[in-house]
Regions:
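Hydrophobic alpha-helical transmembrane segments of multi-pass inner membrane proteins, especially
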Residues: 2-5, 9-248, 294-351, 376, ...
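A juxtamembrane structural motif centered on a specific transmembrane helix
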Residues: 346-393
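Pore-lining and gate-forming transmembrane alpha-helices of multi-pass membrane transport proteins
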Residues: 291, 302, 333-334, 362, ...
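Long extracytoplasmic/lumenal interhelical loops at the membrane interface
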Residues: 247, 254-297
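Short hydrophobic beta-strand that contains or immediately precedes a catalytic carboxylate
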Residues: 83, 255, 363-364
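Transmembrane helix boundary and interhelical junction motifs in multipass membrane proteins
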Residues: 132-137, 266-273, 284-286, 357, ...
Length: 393
């Protein structure tokens, strides 16, 4: 509630009209909370497969009936009401992961790991095709949930390395990257003693797969990424203050950093932000809402907000760990990890550490779909954590 209240305050500073609409979304979210508490936790487990299939149906249908917004065909629009099925996908996938993993242990179980992989790949791939890479990246948060349940840390490290390799390969010659990989592997062999034949075969396979991935990364980037996605990634390696970039692809990042930096230690004061008040930062009510915090509340206000988020997420992890049933624990960790990934990527976006990929700040940014999605995620978990004696159904 503190974050929602603080978010409304900052929205009002940016746009009073948006703040009034957000207040309506907040009031309507209490309806979802009421519905959630009508049901026993076991009911959510029973409807999970049907909800997941319904979500896939919506994600496929958006290609035919969806509206193109900001280059992505990811919204259903019904008059003045719009709905993004990728938000529902976060809920249904969290439930489905918990449903499957409460029945199958993924530790040393390739069959269970395959089932989980299919569940994760289907919605994230459909969302990526829209194309909405930001929402698709959020699904990587489930790797943290899988790690808690026994997934080897190697899988996560490989995933992160492939992302790093992709970014490096589109900015350097793939041949240079392959040469660096080769030198690294040779250096590793000299350090490691008594390598078995199977280990040698595995490392050679890794080198070949990394090399092939690096070689084709620039081709994939140029052919399959839309221009605005390429611009948002490329600007991370350029100087946004350069005249060549500051008036186009670097505009968002330039004024985002300017707004945050101008707040200094204590901020300019509520509703006294010159950059945000001047509406220099595009989407400052959604993706870039943190700029308002940095400018008006300064370093102190920004740190306090981040601490609130971390305490909030830590509390979710604590409640997840104390769950007596596996379903509740896994779902709780999924909720916490989704919020954590949103927080990290959103803060990284406004500070130029990540490309702008449309990731909102949970319970803070403007938007009904995202607010309702986070509300439903959180309160289903709260309902699972609470006693089921108060259920009406």
């Amino acid at each position: 509630m503190i974050m929602i209240f603080f978010g409304c305050m900052n929205l009002y500073s940016v746009s009073p009209e948006k703040a009034e609409k957000q207040l309506i979304w907040i009031l309507l979210s209490f309806f979802f909370i009421f519905i959630i508490f009508l049901f026993k936790p076991i009911h959510y487990k029973h409807i999970t497969p049907f909800l997941f299939l319904f979500t896939l149906f919506l994600l496929i249908g958006v290609f035919f009936f969806g509206k193109n917004v900001n280059g992505s065909k990811s919204w259903y629009v019904f008059g003045s009401i719009s709905f993004q099925p990728s938000e529902l996908a976060k809920i249904s996938t969290s439930l489905m992961i918990a449903h499957i993993m409460s029945q199958e242990n993924i530790e040393n179980n390739n069959k269970a790991l395959l089932h989980i992989s299919i569940i994760l790949v289907l919605p994230s791939f459909l969302i990526l095709l829209q194309p909405d890479p930001g929402s698709s990246i959020v699904f990587s948060s489930f790797l943290l949930t899988l790690y808690r349940e026994g997934l080897s840390i190697s899988f996560i490290l490989y995933f992160l390395f492939y992302i790093l390799l992709f970014v490096v390969s589109i900015n350097l010659s793939p041949w240079i990257v392959i040469l660096l990989l080769f030198i690294s592997f040779i250096f590793f062999f000299f350090l490691k003693k008594n390598i078995s034949f199977l280990d040698l075969f595995f490392y050679i396979f890794l080198f070949i797969s990394f090399s092939v991935f690096s070689f084709f990364s620039p081709f994939v980037f140029q052919k399959f990424f839309k221009q605005h996605h390429k611009d948002r990634i490329n600007i991370l390696f350029q100087n946004e203050f350069d005249r060549k970039y500051r008036d186009n692809v670097g505009y968002n990042l330039l004024y985002s950093k300017t707004a945050i930096g101008s707040g200094k230690f204590f901020g300019k004061g509520y509703q006294k932000g010159t950059v945000t008040k001047g509406k220099f930062v595009p989407e400052q009510h959604t993706d870039y809402i943190f700029c308002t915090v940095g400018e008006e509340w300064g370093f102190i206000g920004s740190v306090i907000l981040i601490i609130f988020y971390l305490l909030f997420i830590s509390r979710i992890y604590f409640l997840s760990e104390r769950q007596k049933n596996i379903f509740g624990r896994i779902f709780g960790y999924s909720v916490g990890n989704i919020l954590f990934i949103h927080l990290i990527i959103n803060l990284g976006m406004v500070m130029g550490l990540f490309p702008t990929i449309g990731i909102v700040l949970p319970f803070f940014s403007y938007g009904g779909s995202s607010l309702w999605s986070f509300t439903v995620l959180l309160f289903i978990f709260i309902r699972i954590d609470a006693s089921d004696q108060t259920s009406l159904i």
